[in-house]
UniProtKB/Swiss-Prot annotation:
Taxonomic placement: Eukaryota, Viridiplantae, Streptophyta, Embryophyta, Tracheophyta
Pathway: Plant hormone degradation; abscisic acid degradation
One CC-aspect GO term: membrane
Transmembrane stretches, start-end: 5-24
Gene: CYP707A1
Protein name: Abscisic acid 8'-hydroxylase 1
Organism: Arabidopsis thaliana (Mouse-ear cress)
GO molecular function: (+)-abscisic acid 8'-hydroxylase activity; heme binding; iron ion binding
Length: 467
């Protein structure tokens, strides 16, 4: 059988299974007294995945909400879904009734990250993992990382001087190196390039269809995933042989009295890299764009950072205390997180039939709280399309600003993310200027919304001035 015939057979089989599932679902839901939420399910199997990832997510989500209301159904990444777009609904799913909605991801991403990763669990195992991750990422732990993160930031900036760079790609390298530092300390130096090579192949298949055939993105990614696990096994073996203790994330995992298995450790390390890298790099790209487009804000941030620099001796490093003297910078980060809404939504799965606002959310269906819709609601944030850090001079109302999620599954590494962004902004604004190359108003859509072409910029060193 040639390859085209094989794919045709697989497609026909998938189509048959899709219609069979639809028939079973129709019979099951037909006996329920509650209706499904309004909405459309798109094409067989692929649903509305292409529409979601090929256009402005604001247009996709807001047009659905405008037509169907704050609760509607769709079909993306091979899954029937209910999308919710109000603070009250998000709280219902993520906090109040979180036990009815287990965390989940598309099948391809679950297999690549590993089934033992913290994202996919609830109950005692999740609580145990979260405690271990928080132990490594709490302020008392990451405050000691400031000099090393600063060194990574300075090395990155020096390598960008005088050249045109793709901001997103370079920030991915920066955040990847910070992620490795937080996970392995300085022990990963010998394996850094191999870890990077394997992970870069792995990430390309995160949103692919889970078809494990030679030549597919999924197949290539799973091969890289296997090699990544082998590298992590070598690192674990070396640490056990050395017998020394470490204050990094790997040390936290290995120091657990109940002992995680090597598979559990590997799955969660890969999961942390996934959570720490692309999202933070995306936010940093948007920060540079918004600062370049808002010179008054850039000037004010620069003044704030220069005031910190003036208190330093030549070559003196930043401290944890310095990073807490950046209120405007913090508001810039918050407003970027709101406007860009890197995390447009999160995935949950109903563990039983659930009623919400008179609609049935069937067991097994994915439920997606739409953070982007909430962050761009004019009822919550006035003039929501405008970049205005001053709006965060007053704390937002509960459940209206959720850039790191909400509830027990909120991102445990958010303090580290804000720290590495603050350190990078300090050195960018006090030592460098940058200009955007080409049009700056385009947006590139995919798993994350990015500035067009990753925001090409030219970075130049500022003349040295007396401080």
């Amino acid at each position: 059988m040639d390859i085209s015939a094989l794919f045709l057979t697989l497609f026909a089989g998938s189509l048959f299974l899709y219609f069979l599932r639809c028939l079973i679902s129709q019979r099951r839901f037909g006996s329920s007294k509650l209706p499904l939420p309004p909405g459309t399910m798109g094409w067989p199997y692929v649903g509305e995945t292409f529409q979601l990832y090929s256009q402005d997510p604001n247009v996709f989500f807001q047009s659905k909400q405008k037509r169907y209301g704050s609760v509607f159904k769709t079909h993306v990444l091979g899954c029937p879904c209910v999308m919710i777009s109000s603070p009250e609904a998000a709280k219902f799913v993520l906090v109040t009734k979180s036990h009815l909605f287990k965390p989940t991801f598309p099948a391809s991403k679950e297999r690549m990250l590993g089934k033992q990763a913290i994202f996919f669990h609830q109950g005692d195992y999740h609580a145990k993992l979260r405690k271990l991750v928080l132990r490594a990422f709490m302020p008392e732990s990451i405050r000691n990382m400031v000099p090393d993160i600063e060194s990574i930031a300075q090395d990155s900036l020096r390598s960008w001087e005088g050249t045109m760079i793709n901001t997103y790609q370079e920030m991915k390298t920066y955040t990847f190196n910070v992620a490795l530092l937080s996970i392995f300390g300085k022990d990963e130096v010998l394996y850094r390039e191999d870890l990077k090579r394997c992970y870069y192949i792995l990430e390309k298949g995160y949103n692919s269809m889970p078809v494990n055939l030679p030549g597919t993105l999924f197949h290539k990614s799973m091969k890289a995933r296997k090699e990544l696990s082998q590298i992590l096994a070598r690192i674990l073996s070396e640490r056990r042989q050395n017998g020394s203790s470490h204050n990094d994330l790997l040390g936290s995992f290995m120091g657990d009295k109940e002992e995680l298995t090597d598979e559990q450790i590997a799955d969660n390390i890969i999961g942390v890299i996934f959570a720490a890298r692309d999202t933070t790099a995306s936010v940093m790209s948007w920060i540079l764009k918004y600062l370049a487009e808002n010179p008054n804000v850039l000037e004010a941030v620069t003044e704030e950072q220069m005031a910190i620099r003036k208190d330093k001796e030549e070559g003196e490093s930043l401290t944890w205390g310095d990073t807490k003297k950046m209120p405007l910078t913090s508001r810039v980060i918050q407003e970027t997180l709101r406007v860009a809404s890197i995390l447009s939504f999160t995935f949950r799965e109903a563990v039983e039939d659930v009623e919400y606002e008179g609609y049935l959310i069937p067991k097994g269906w994915k439920v997606l709280p739409l953070f982007r819709n909430i962050h761009h609601s004019a009822d919550i944030f006035s003039n929501p399309g405008k970049f205005d850090p001053s709006r965060f001079e007053v704390a937002p109302k509960p459940n209206t600003f959720m850039p790191f999620g909400n509830g027990t599954h909120s991102c445990p590494g958010n303090e580290l993310a804000k720290l590495e962004m603050s350190i990078m902004i300090h050195h960018l604004t006090t030592k460098y200027s940058w200009s955007i190359v080409g049009a700056s108003d385009g947006i590139q859509y995919g798993p994350f919304a990015l500035p067009q072409n990753g925001l090409p910029i030219v970075l130049a060193r500022k003349p040295e001035i007396e401080v």
